[in-house]
């Protein structure tokens, strides 16, 4: 969902299923383009794809659908960094884009995807995990957002393996109606 103005790039890496959607309907991600913009060269990626950043640095693509159907995360062994975007919430919230009527179906799919990701995440335990929004790590409670924005938040829950485990539990509790 963070692909606004992708037409300003020569080449864009995008999950293979989203590339296929664009090929079938160029308007499916119309908000991604500037007015009158055209899609750049789209490079399909999927679980196991490796993107060469140059200088001997690569990132491995790991599927983690949920925030969007085809969300991915990127692991960089060179810098021991995992870039999760919005694919992993914070243990406090689940960041998903779906119609409300599809919420439980998407939650069940997200839970399954998190469970599949867990064994891979174990190998990334000692990596630095970077989310899409720093507020994810500082709680999203509206009463405390101003504290976070002012740099005086007392809540800090950095993204890490345990958050993935917490998100599985959170999904289950939402699915069963416990919360």
Region annotations inferred by a language model:
Residues 1-51, 151-167:
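Active-site HxH/HxHxD metal-binding segment of metal-dependent hydrolases
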Residues 11, 16, 21, 38, ...:
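Context-gated lysine
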Residues 58-65, 69-159, 166:
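Metallo-beta-lactamase
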Residues 163-179:
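C-terminal regulatory/interaction regions
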